[in-house]
Amino acid sequence: MNGLFLFCVATTAALAYGSDAPCTNSGGVCQDDHLACHNGHYQSGLCTGGAHRRCCLTSASHTGSFSTGIVSQQCLQCICNVESGCKAIGCHFDVNSDSCGYFQIKEGYWHDCGSPGSSWRSCANDLACASKCVQAYMSRYIGFSGCSHSCESYARIHNGGPAGCKHTNTLGYWSHVHAQGCSHNSK
């Protein structure tokens, strides 16, 4: 009888709360908003359940600055704007796998950049960590296939992989980055 009671309680809780994936994919935790959200803020619409159950997102996931490296701050800003409006937007299914965070980083890209931070999803949703990953990825692949040190090359590699600057299918992506105010020489 006790087992049946626990099953009913667990089932009711699962139905009441459903999936918290939108919150957890953004690096947050679903909880009642009467609890303190230390070093962060609450965002509605990412958790299922009652009206007072909201996503606690830490400030570290949503603020900070770009990591320094071979890609200029301006170029990082343009790429970030194209990918997410430069917001920690969580993960979305894109071209056969999830892309996450500020720069819409895929898990393979995160491994190639040295796997910074505590996990792929949390790094992608932290501006400093995500931009560190982009910097490391570019440092690793910029010389591949003769790509030049330019914002155009960085953007096209970000979009198309290590030889992305040589693929014509990344020219459209570069147009979007260029429209954000970056030029070929923005580095």
Swiss-Prot record:
Indicate the segments forming the I-type lysozyme domain, all copies: 68-183
Which keywords are on file for this protein? Antibiotic, Antimicrobial, Bacteriolytic enzyme, Disulfide bond, Glycosidase, Hydrolase, Secreted, Signal
UniProt pH dependence: Optimum pH is 7.5-8.5.
The EC number(s) attached to this protein equal: 3.2.1.17
GO biological process annotations for this chain's record?
A: defense response to Gram-negative bacterium; killing of cells of another organism
Which residues take part in binding substrate? K106, E107, G108, Y109, W110, H111, D112, Y137, H158, N159, G160
Reported tissue expression: Highest levels of expression detected in the digestive glands. Lower levels in the mantle, labial palps, gills and style-midgut sac, and lowest levels detected in the hemocytes. Not detected in the gonads.
Catalytic machinery residues: E83, D94
> Cellular component per GO?
extracellular region
Extract the signal peptide range. 1-18
This protein's superkingdom?
Eukaryota
Please give the positions of the paired cysteines in each disulfide bond.
Answer: C75-C151, C80-C86, C91-C100, C113-C133, C123-C129, C147-C165
Q: Name one GO molecular function term.
A: lysozyme activity
Q: What is the enzyme's main class?
A: hydrolase
What this protein catalyses is: Hydrolysis of (1->4)-beta-linkages between N-acetylmuramic acid and N-acetyl-D-glucosamine residues in a peptidoglycan and between N-acetyl-D-glucosamine residues in chitodextrins
* Protein localization: Secreted
Protein task: Has antibacterial activity against the Gram-negative bacterium E.coli. No antibacterial activity detected against the Gram-negative bacterium V.vulnificus.
Family assignment? Belongs to the glycosyl hydrolase 22 family. Type-I lysozyme subfamily.
* Protein's recorded name: Lysozyme 3
Q: What organism does the UniProt record list as the source?
A: Crassostrea virginica
